[in-house]
UniProtKB/Swiss-Prot annotation:
Sorted UniProt keywords: Antibiotic biosynthesis, Oxidoreductase
Biological process (GO), any one: antibiotic biosynthetic process
Name assigned to this protein: Actinorhodin polyketide dimerase
Enzyme class: oxidoreductase
UniProt-listed Enzyme Commission number(s): 1.-.-.-
SMART domains attached to this UniProt entry: Flavin_Reduct
The keyword Oxidoreductase appears for this protein: yes
Name of the gene this protein is made from: actVB
Pfam families: Flavin_Reduct
Length: 177
């Protein structure tokens, strides 16, 4: 007997996840994107990473046929942008500082990390698709605290001792400032 979907959603909501924008271009060169909390490193040799996308997403046809995609890992102050990219009808690229990389990807300027991939493989996975990418380029910012999503909301990245990472990477008290 399969697990209850509601209970599974509740259980998975308890798993903290980073938040990223995943972007690709359609055949006409128009950028498309979605918000993902399913960005995962798979292998270092060869360098592989994956994202998952619902088959019902408006951008599904683009990602089901693209040859490349990029992942912009969001900072904690990018939550409005994360919500915009999670909606079906939003003009996702209006506002926000998007730039083109040397490889041609559209990425968020100021993301804590950017990972550019060529599609290595696509795997059907129930009502989703797993997009496995071979990492071609990585850029990491030295400053910035990553966005975290847990219990169906954005949360601060803090230790049990009450220290939150600062933009310099050192812990600061959760109630400071």
């Amino acid at each position: 007997m399969a697990a209850d979907q509601g209970m599974l959603r509740d259980a998975m909501a308890r798993v903290p996840a980073g938040v990223a924008l995943v972007t690709a271009h359609d055949r006409g060169g128009v950028p498309h994107g979605f918000t993902a909390s399913s960005f995962v490193s798979v292998s270092m040799e060869p360098p592989l990473a994956l994202v998952c996308l619902a088959r019902t997403a408006n951008s599904f046809p683009v990602f089901d046929s693209c040859g490349e995609f990029a992942v912009s890992v969001l900072r904690e102050d990018h939550t409005d942008l994360a919500m915009r990219f999670a909606r079906k009808s939003a003009d996702k690229f209006a506002g926000g500082e998007f730039v083109r990389t040397a490889r041609g990807a559209t990425v968020l300027d100021g993301a804590v990390a950017v990972v550019e991939c060529t599609v290595h493989e696509r795997y059907p996975a129930g009502d989703h698709i797993i997009l496995l990418g071979e990492v071609q380029s990585v850029h990491v910012e030295e400053k910035g605290v990553p966005a975290v999503y847990v219990d169906r909301r954005f949360a601060a990245l803090c230790s049990a001792a009450g220290a939150c990472p600062s933009a310099t990477g050192r812990g600061v008290p959760a109630h400071a400032g």
